[in-house]
């Protein structure tokens, strides 16, 4: 289902953004 694929990709991107924000807070 393309909708589920989009959701997983979106959640992956959101997780990536949160990780980058976390790394920026460490630096």
UniProtKB/Swiss-Prot annotation:
InterPro entries: Glucagon_GIP_secretin_VIP. GO terms for cellular component: extracellular space. The modification Methionine amide is found at residue 27. PROSITE patterns: GLUCAGON. Belongs to the glucagon family. It comes from the Eukaryota. The lineage of its organism: Eukaryota, Metazoa, Chordata, Craniata, Vertebrata. It is found in: Secreted. It comes from Gallus gallus. This is Secretin. GO terms for molecular function: digestive hormone activity; hormone activity.
């Amino acid at each position: 289902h393309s909708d589920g694929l989009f959701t997983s990709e979106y959640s992956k991107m959101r997780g990536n953004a949160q990780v980058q924000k976390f790394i920026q807070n460490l630096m």
